[in-house]
Amino acid sequence: MLAPRWLTALAVAACVGIALGVGLGLARPRSAPRSDQNRELALHGQAQWAAGSRLAPAFALRGAAGGLFSLRSERRHIVLLTFLDSRCKRACPLEGRMLGDVGRDLKSSGVPVELVVVTVDPWGDTRGSIRKFMRESRWNLPWRWLGGSPGRLRPIWHAYGIGVKQVPGDIVHSVVLYVVDRGGYLRIAYLFPFVPREVALDIRHLARSY
């Protein structure tokens, strides 16, 4: 299942924008499709889907610690899904710290949330670079950093509208954060930079409505 065309186009455009030093947030649309149900929940995010309307594209990948993660089998947690480079020096560390802020906001809420990262740098990620990234981002949520061969990852990047390009000394890629509910359905997509407080608020709303 492919991402909405407008989101894919924005993600690819943002991929180019990052190479030029332009934040993805500058490419945000003035309005995005929102379901009546999500309006009632007062959710944020540039793309929103009604409950049960769009299954998140399925994938199964191994984590940095070696265990296999299947998105389709994950029903215990609301999943925050994003795509990062552990050696990135620009947008990724910023998003990492924002995700840390989301986790701290949710710490006392009791909401079952898991952070799932799919790498955009299968050529350079190491366990050491992943641990360093996680430590500097100060994550307190349960998290998984998933990888695989470029051939295995490309269909997943494509399904979620993530543009990835190798350039000398860097990986240029788009930055999108998805929320997948406990039924395995897409609910919200945020373009970078998002507001951590709004993401945490949306997750609380979804947890109460599920």
Model-derived regions, located:
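Hydrophobic beta-strand anchors of alpha/beta hydrolase catalytic cores
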Residues: 80-81, 115, 177
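A short beta-strand-turn-helix
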Residues: 59-80, 103-106
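Thiol-/selenol-based redox modules, centered on thioredoxin-like
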Residues: 167-210
